[in-house]
Amino acid sequence: MNLNLILPLKKVVLPISNKEVSIPKMGLKHYNILKDVKGPDENLKLLIDSICPNLSPAEVDFVSIHLLEFNGKIKSRKEIDGYTYDINDVYVCQRLEFQYQGNTFYFRPPGKFEQFLTVSDMLSKCLLRVNDEVKEINFLEMPAFVLKWANDIFTTLAIPGPNGPITGIGNIIGLFE
């Protein structure tokens, strides 16, 4: 007996690359991918790569939110204090370019599971260039507002709220649980 099952798919367009991705209902294929015991980081990477390989960290978070919603782990809409939040309003808020004293600092997005010891370590390792030249910058000697740069680089997703955007994948998942 040959069963040709067609699993439902949800189509989403990735905000950075404008690539259309099909979000699947989790099934036996995904169980087989995750059945071997691995770390949560590695399991998530395998799962997301099976859906769409080579995504940026912000796109991984975006696909993860829609994967959770489509598989019934979080709600797609939620009303809190008279304001309705909708999963389709989630957007990428990551900033990778900053201005200071006439210079433009360009950063790469940190890897999805990349770890750093300190904020200055993160900024130093993610710095691509200043203006058009590669430079070593000691971020400890810069003003304290570079901490906000680190937060803007590391925060990938946001959703509009009545009192300003709610940022971070953890906060957004918590909102829709």
UniProtKB/Swiss-Prot annotation:
Keywords: Late protein, Viral release from host cell, Viral tail assembly. Pfam families: Phage_hub_GP28. GO terms for biological process: viral tail assembly. The keyword Transcription does not apply. InterPro entries: Phage_T4_Gp28 (IPR024342). Baseplate hub assembly chaperone involved in the tail assembly. The gp27 and gp28 proteins seem to combine to form a small hub precursor during morphogenesis. This is Baseplate hub assembly protein gp28. The lineage of its organism: Viruses, Duplodnaviria, Heunggongvirae, Uroviricota, Caudoviricetes.
